[in-house]
Amino acid sequence: MIKEPEFRDYTPGKLEEKIEQFWKESNIYQKVKELRKNGPKYYFLDGPPYVSGAIHLGTAWNKIIKDMIIRFRTMQGYNVWRQPGYDMHGLPIEVKVEQALGLKTKKEIEEKIGVENFIQKCKEFALNNLRIMTEQFKMLGVWMDWDNPYMTIKNEYIESAWFTLKRAWEKGLLEKDKRVLHWCPRCETALAEHEVRGEYKLRKDPSIYVKFPVEGKENEYLLIWTTTPWTLPANLAVSAHPDYDYVKVRVDLNGREEYWILAKALVEKVLGDIGVKGEVVEEFKGKELEGLRYVHILMDEYPRQKEFREKYEWVHRVILADFVTLEEGTGLVHTAPGHGEEDFEVGQKYGLPVYSPVDDQGKYVEGKWKGVYVKEADPQIIEHLKEKGYLVKAGEIEHKYPHCWRCKTPLIFRATDQWFLKVSKVKEKIIKENDEKVTWYPEWVKIRFDNGVRDSGDWVISRQRYWGIPLPIWQSEDGEIYVVGSWKELVELAVAIEVNGERIDLPESYEEKLKVIEEKLGPEDLHRPYVDAFIIKVNGKEMRRVKDVVDVWFDSGIASWASLGYPRNKELFEKLWPADFIVEGEDQVTKWFYSQQAASVIAFDTVPYRAVAMHGYVLDEKGDKMSKSLGNIIRPEEVVEKAGRDTFRFYMLWATNPWENLKFSWKGVEQVRRMLNILWNVYVLSATYMSLDNFDPRNVKVEELEFREEDKWILSRVNNLIKEVENGIETFYLTKATRALYNFVVEDLSRWYVRLIRKRLWVEGDDPDKLAAYYTLWKVFDVLLRLMAPFTPYITEEIYQNIMRPFTGIESVHMLDWPKPDESAVDEELEREMEFIRRIVEAGSAARQKAKIKLRYPVRKIIIETQDDTVKKAVERLNYILRDQLNAKEVVVGNVEREITVKPNFAKVGPEFKGDARLVAKWISEHGLELYEKGEVDVEIEGKKFHLTREHIIVEENIPDFLVAEDFEGGRVYVDKTLTRELLAEGLAREFVRRIQEMRKRLDLDVNDRIVVTIETTEENRELLQENLEYIMRETRAIEVRFEEAKGYVVEWPEVQAKIGIEKIE
């Protein structure tokens, strides 16, 4: 049976701990899974959060969305695959471990601690953070298989990566190539395009104009501009656009005449920037410059430049390129194929060497600045060029520049040999598969994704690091390669292992090999340096592993099949793949969403997921990014501690559309907490009365109950609510769902329905009208708790356990089915009519306030003036509600006689008609009523024509003095403010009832407790109160009201000139 609530007040902390304990002790999570094990499959793929530290509000938002979707699908009957995942390799962890160990370079890693120890430290760091993050996710009420997460560091996961890369190799989509790529000199590794997107930050760099002497021409120069002076030692050409107009400009430099070649369109800007005047002496097309030779300005400092000049025809010449623009610079571009993507491409076309005199740490390996870090060489190079007379002007520029996504070091462009996935060959396939098979939420993100795919280059997947999936590429001394696809294949091909520099040949038998491997290397571990020890033999050639590891984005890119253990475990893959739904933050559109599709199309020729949703970032209240430096970070634990898990969860799904950025607001959090408090109060009220009357919905004969219009209305609303919430979730328009729930709880259920039925709940005995209200409330909770359970799992569980479980026999709210709307209960017309009734009540209350008549004092009559048929029907059908809520003896539809005065609106007439304003104003004074009735008129006054509208008039209405009016959308409410003795007596009785009830509350009396009331008051009050003594006794549960000295618990109420005493009857 229903009991009185354990907590009278909503205390999230206590309540949620209690529910956590219940779930744990009753093993509810496992029971929920067991219940749905035969349902249709739903593969929810958890995008693995990176284990570099504790979760933040963005991570929490992400997991809350995921948990809500999982709970929703489970209630729909799906057997949801809900394995959490963790991204555990990569640079971010290496950087953290390096900092902890005080290491600064790769050399220090190898010499001070050793690769094996470093990798062990990375593993420990990752596993420790995994444990911390798991507890934080559990704290949010997230239900996933926490005992069985997928981890990118597990052998079977790494083997999935090897399988995928082997598939790429077999398709001709994996190859080694020299390319110019972003390079992090601190981490000493290449970075892929998608790692750099979003990592451009403002920084100041040099901005210099330099002149290259034209060979064989005295005082004639090619004028170039650059922000990377450090790349000038590697300059091999100057690029011009074939179709642009170029000019030779004569300039006067302190009495010395020089000739500069640059783009015609940039002459004024460049000369103005440099601060010199010039005269154009010759004009020509860019293509005419092709082949023009210049003298390298650092030839002596970098002797290799002389070798290149002699060996390559196009070195130190003007070449043609379409990438040259007129937006900045001089129209002539300093070209270094070893340090620029476009430079590299045009260099290939002209047969230029790829020259990059810079090592992995970003230091020069030769020439004048050997051993100097390139960015530190900038000022030295500028000063040197000044001394040599080649510097025209040096300045500074603030621009967006790419930084390492983890260590934040400015990147450099550098040519290196790397391994690439040839995504360029499958781009069109990715776009086609995506457009045909993937549903995007919101839909416009699909276009952004497709454009990203079109703009992407080949995927550089090699990293010159340690903590990552080792590239499964073995290479012979003569350059032949073989890609290993599994642990089994590696063992089969292995002929020897190398341990501490010693070669150990392996026996031929597979089982014997395994024994030796385990004895010498330990159990299978597909990380470095374990796999580095293997020497394999293919085509009669011994091969050793390429030392690189795989881009960490590849780890998560294969998650949809690697998390299922494929290809080691084919059964799960065949049952579940592809994923039905994924959801991640906005930055993942060009990262994880992309890396998955690229890897999947390469491996399986199709996409790995069927539906994808994107959410925004969490910002502070002002819209700023949360950061330590700004001191505006709010931790998830802080929100849970202050407001509770349910409040936090609901707020994050209510505050904004999921694809927009969420500006976190404590006011918003408090607003949601108040909503849940309102829900709790409705529950406490319902459960308290139901428990007193031993209400049992199973014993109710529904067909015998006479439901009132408000009962039918709330049942109609709650059934429509099912559609609204479900539609909001299905379309990922989550705010539609949460705001519909919020409005239903606050406006429909609490502020309206409960307000309408309170008096019915007070009636004693088995009153059928009260029973109808109980049953309606119970049915509303039956639906509402199911709808809210995925959003607020704790409060719904607590309420369910008391008012639902005794009658359903089902152990948890989360084991219930998602509700289906009862169309027979939906009455759209009644809902429309009730909406008007609420508006009329609001307007009527405002009118009473104008008249300064408290709601407790009844009024004689209220008139509703309207032309709307729905309003008329509503007033007729729901008249009893209006009478009760507006405390009126009579509510009727009718018209009120009133006098209308129309005056000119001089604020409008004067400025518009100027000199004719007097004529117009006179006409309005005489004929204004005609204009008011028609809305607009064309008139002729003294031979002049005017167009007049209601904007030109001010309308004053004079209604009878005993009425006060207020408009509502659909009409107007008139309240008759005449107060008779009878009305005064009734109002005073209500005033006293309210105060007695307040005193009962202060004494914490039970609803059923009986009292005796004693009242000391004026003679006039006593006479008025005696007219309504029965009403006072009934409403206050008093067995007697006596007019004498107040006794017991006594309170003086000056505003009604009375002392009231109450005594509980034992």
UniProtKB/Swiss-Prot annotation:
InterPro entries: aa-tRNA-synth_I_CS, aa-tRNA-synth_Ia, Anticodon_Ile_ABEc, Ile-tRNA-ligase, Ile-tRNA-ligase_type2, M/V/L/I-tRNA-synth_anticd-bd, Rossmann-like_a/b/a_fold, tRNAsynth_Ia_anticodon-bd. Pfam families: Anticodon_1 (PF08264), DUF5915 (PF19302), tRNA-synt_1 (PF00133). Gene3D superfamilies: 3.30.720.200, HUPs, Isoleucyl-tRNA Synthetase, Domain 1, Valyl/Leucyl/Isoleucyl-tRNA synthetase, editing domain. Monomer. NCBIfam families: ileS. IleRS has two distinct active sites: one for aminoacylation and one for editing. The misactivated valine is translocated from the active site to the editing site, which sterically excludes the correctly activated isoleucine. The single editing site contains two valyl binding pockets, one specific for each substrate (Val-AMP or Val-tRNA(Ile)). This is Isoleucine--tRNA ligase. It comes from Pyrococcus furiosus (strain ATCC 43587 / DSM 3638 / JCM 8422 / Vc1).
